[in-house]
Design a protein with these regions (language model features):
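Active-site acidic/histidine proton-transfer and metal-coordination neighborhood
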Residues: 56-67, 77-177, 187-188, 268, ...
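Short, conserved active-site loops that position catalytic residues or coordinate cofactors/metal ions
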Residues: 26, 31-40, 66-75
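Active-site mouth loops of central-metabolism enzymes
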Residues: 2-14, 76-88
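Active-site-proximal loop/turn and secondary-structure-junction residues that shape catalytic pockets
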Residues: 9-11, 35-37, 74-77, 110-114, ...
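Hydrophobic residues within beta-strands of alpha/beta enzymes
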Residues: 31-33, 69-71, 106, 138, ...
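A short acidic, helix-capping loop that chelates divalent metal ions and anchors anionic groups
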Residues: 39-44, 77-82, 146-151, 216-220, ...
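Histidine-acidic metal/acid-base catalytic patches
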Residues: 1-4, 12-29, 62, 102, ...
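Glycine-rich, proline-tolerant flexible connector loops at the mouths of alpha/beta enzymes
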Residues: 32-58
Length: 292
């Protein structure tokens, strides 16, 4: 299991190459390329020669000795049927870029305006052939929906353990997996992350987004802050023998710090994640010993 962190906030402030170097220098094992930043206008992958640019980034990262193991597709507006259809071409491009970078999984959000059948027919059925061609898995993520106010939040697509399991089993493709966002189950009217882990199990759960919140909004905060029961989460990940990576998506935690304190903040983030990974391995060993 590798400790991975997202490029988003570093990319926004310094550019993608510097983001990757910083992630390497701060001691992370690999990086998650956030394409909703890297594909923005003026960014490396917004140009017509995006695959060439991806090859350049891949070579740069390889020379640094750090790999891209995961990516996050852009976030186009999928609140209408036409929006979902328009997102297909954006996501195809994102899949191609991610594969060149070396990612094993790309997270592509389902739309919460339709069910699994609608998401498959409008979105994933068009993307899975591209994923297979490029040998990269697509991961759906557990979503939430804001209703008539910022804090009026309810589960969206894949937003309950049962619905997430249904998505994976309905599409039933070796190139389709689950990315469990640990922060989203802390939000109102949702169920704890450990219930999702138990329901998804080893075969369905392929990736994680590690962050936390106070239970009121999607804050993408550092682990150990907020509502998440990290001890139980680590135990359940060990119990299902989770085989994916440990990917931080706690970028908003860094937003409140001045540049002078960013190294200290990232160091705390890194140490927090390493501690959680150690917990998982400790529980994994204990569980194996109990079954011997």
């Amino acid at each position: 299991m590798k400790l991975v962190t997202a490029t988003q906030e570093f990319d926004r402030k310094y550019g993608l190459k510097t983001a990757i170097k910083l992630i390497k220098d701060y001691g992370f094992d690999a990086y998650d390329c956030n394409l909703y930043e890297a594909m923005k206008k003026g960014k490396p992958f917004a140009s017509d020669d995006y695959l060439k640019r991806a090859e350049e980034i891949r070579e740069y990262a390889d020379n640094l000795g750090i790999s891209c193991v995961q990516a996050h597709a852009p976030l186009p507006n999928v609140k209408t049927i036409e929006g979902i259809k328009a997102a297909v071409e954006v996501h195809k491009k994102a899949i191609e870029i991610s594969a060149v970078l070396g990612a094993e999984i790309i997270i592509i959000h389902p739309s919460s305006i339709t069910d699994v059948k609608g998401n498959y027919e409008l979105l994933y059925s068009h993307l899975l052939p591209v994923a297979k061609k490029n040998n990269i898995k697509i991961a759906a993520e557990n979503m939430f929906v804001r209703l008539d106010g910022a804090l009026n939040i309810v589960p969206g697509a894949c937003g309950t353990p049962e619905d997430f399991v249904h998505y994976i089993d309905y599409i039933s493709d070796p190139y389709f997996t689950a990315c469990l966002d640990i922060g989203h189950p802390c939000l109102p009217h949702t169920r704890p992350a450990q219930e999702f882990i138990r329901a998804l199990g080893n075969k369905r759960l392929g990736a994680l987004h590690i962050h936390s919140n106070s239970g009121h909004d999607d804050q993408h905060a550092i682990p150990f802050y907020g509502k998440a029961d990290w001890d139980e989460i680590c135990y359940e990940l060990a119990k299902i023998d989770y085989q994916g990576n440990f990917t931080l998506e706690a970028y908003k935690f860094l937003l409140s710090f001045p540049d002078e304190l960013i190294p200290y903040a990232v160091n705390l983030l890194h140490k927090s994640a390493r501690l959680l990974m150690e917990k998982i391995e400790k529980y994994r060993t204990e569980i194996k010993n109990e079954t011997c």
